[in-house]
Each structure stands twice: as C-alpha cells, then as structure tokens.
C-alpha cells in the first residue's frame, strides 16, 4: 500500500490484514507541498503516524515514504524533494528493525530527474513511457 496517510486507514489495514492472515508493506504518504486538494499526512504530523504504525500495528510493515510534489519548476522540485528526503531519513531512524533499505517514492514524468537526484528509489513515470507524442495515452 503506497498511500497510508492516517491512523484510521492504518487501523483498517491492520484489521483486514489480521482477517486475511497477511502482513502488508506500507509507504506513508506525506503531503510535502501542503496542498489542500492532495492526500497525505502533513510533514509536522508524520512522526506521530510513524510511531503509531511501528508501535501498534503488527500486521503493517513500514517500508518507507511517498509524496507527490506540486507541479513546479526545477528549483521548487529540488527544494521539495530535498525536504522530503531529509524528513524521510529522520523518520526512518524511528523505525525499529530497519533490516531493509528505506523506499523513497517521489517524482513523476515531469520531475523524476530531480527526485532521483534527491534520493528517490521509486519513481512513477507512466506518462513518459506510454504517452504518444501529442500527450495522449491511447
């Protein structure tokens, strides 16, 4: 699950995972651009969610963090992705038993180069791969 952004969703994922006898890998989604229309926990509330997931949900395995930056220019992408990397690294230190590398999912077709430069380990570039020259995907 790449969009865990609230304690309520964590509780429901835990409940469903228990019901089906599974452990679910999750990424906590952080609204790094603080956009009201986008989902994700605000940066200042992320630590509380990390502590809740790591401390109270044995069926959820925190693997890392994800964000979707607002559309912008190179400077704004670099700034936001740098902020996200630093925040994610500090939050990852709170994660017990960090036996695997942290997943840092950020960057899309317009911004993945900046995201990778700031440490992204996962990018979403569907449009860059599948769009025709006119921007259409069909």
Where are these regions (language model features)?
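Active-site-proximal glycine-rich helix-loop-beta segment
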Residues: 119-121, 126
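Conserved alpha/beta-domain cores
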Residues: 1-112, 116-118, 130
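Active-site loop ensemble at the mouth of alpha/beta enzyme cores that anchors a bound cofactor
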Residues: 136-138
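EAL-family c-di-GMP phosphodiesterase catalytic domain
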Residues: 122, 131-133
């Amino acid at each position: 699950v790449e969009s865990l952004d609230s304690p309520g969703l964590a509780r429901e994922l835990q409940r469903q995972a228990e019901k089906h006898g599974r452990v679910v890998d999750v990424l906590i989604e952080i609204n790094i651009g603080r956009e009201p229309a986008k989902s994700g926990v605000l940066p200042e509330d992320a630590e509380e969610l990390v502590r809740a997931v790591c401390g109270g949900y044995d069926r959820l395995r925190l693997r890392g963090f994800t964000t979707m930056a607002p559309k912008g220019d190179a400077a704004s992408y670099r700034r936001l992705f740098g902020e996200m990397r630093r925040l994610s690294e500090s939050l990852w230190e709170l994660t017990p038993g960090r036996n695997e590398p942290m997943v840092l999912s950020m960057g899309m077709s317009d911004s993945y180069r900046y995201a990778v430069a700031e440490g992204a380990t996962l990018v979403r570039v569907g449009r860059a791969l599948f769009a025709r020259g006119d921007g259409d995907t069909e």
